[in-house]
């Protein structure tokens, strides 16, 4: 039953990963359907303020409490405040003790209960906390998504069962639970019917997907799911994130040869180049095994773009360990990375490890990692100049100085942003552009005129 037209507004601030972005969209959908809330980007106009949090790094966690303090004054006019996501899951009722003006605390698996929690808050006149792990229940209680554009996220699983020594995800999101195979396909088909051309399949470890097929006992793995998603009419591109190298199997690699909709880009977190550190992280593979997987993939897709994650300054990291990370970067040729200094998370095994490396050394190592990968990115970007790239046009350029000139932006298969001049009617379309310039984090192109088309690269 729709509750549209109430005039109530919700402000949602999202921290962290794409899973959180997806969850924030679902919070908005749930609140719109149940209570008529409409999203706002102006916190001062909100009747409800939600922070969807991340606890992967200490800085992100502390920023949540800083932001809470900044909106506390809005309670005077009856605004409700909620905290969801991984910090909420980790802190639970302790969050209320630290910020007693918070009305609701909910975990990633209980966001669908938001309307009920808010109602109980009013009825009982006390804060509500629900950070339970009701497996995949939330997907059965979410209203249909409202599509805005030609791209969409689709969550295919929740949680992680890898228990890396530094990571809180298994404790904040629970162990791996896969959505039923048919449920995922139904959602993707619905999105395609609404004009979506590109889907990004989400999970903490998507290649660990094991979804039940219909009413049978059969289980679909991630490779099979990709093949079925590719058969859905209208889906031109498939992305996924995040993966774990342990389950980047030959069966999954072979899908790249059979499914052209699978984009020419892979994000595969390696975290470190030293086998000694990888073992301490409990990652379960060696740098050689990681490179072997990449070599097999490049035998099928020679020009695939690769991005990754690196943790610098893990307890006990030596100069030799760091040198091995730099060698891995050189050997693999990553296009992009998310690189951070290690941040001890309470309750994880790594938090008990002795860490005596000075922060200045860690910062220097981080800079070396980032500079090496940025150099790779610049080289790869320059190599695209003069080539033809197919891009999916997402909308106006995000660079303010270009918007006055009616600039648009889109992404290549390799996830490079391309800015170009063109009419707004191209939004949502797949078009060919000739790349004319390369910048550190984007490309510039011209819409290809068919009558004078160069050969695609």
UniProtKB/Swiss-Prot annotation:
Residues 382-449 form the TRAM domain. One of its GO terms (cellular component) is cytosol. Its cofactor is [4Fe-4S] cluster. CDD domains: Radical_SAM (cd01335). It catalyses: N(6)-dimethylallyladenosine(37) in tRNA + (sulfur carrier)-SH + AH2 + 2 S-adenosyl-L-methionine = 2-methylsulfanyl-N(6)-dimethylallyladenosine(37) in tRNA + (sulfur carrier)-H + 5'-deoxyadenosine + L-methionine + A + S-adenosyl-L-homocysteine + 2 H(+). Residues 8-123 form the MTTase N-terminal domain. SUPFAM superfamilies: Radical SAM enzymes. Residues 146-379 form the Radical SAM core domain. [4Fe-4S] cluster 1 binds at residues 17, 54, 86. Its EC number is 2.8.4.3. It is found in: Cytoplasm. Its main location: cytoplasm. It comes from the Bacteria. One of its GO terms (molecular function) is 4 iron, 4 sulfur cluster binding. Belongs to the methylthiotransferase family. MiaB subfamily. This is tRNA-2-methylthio-N(6)-dimethylallyladenosine synthase.
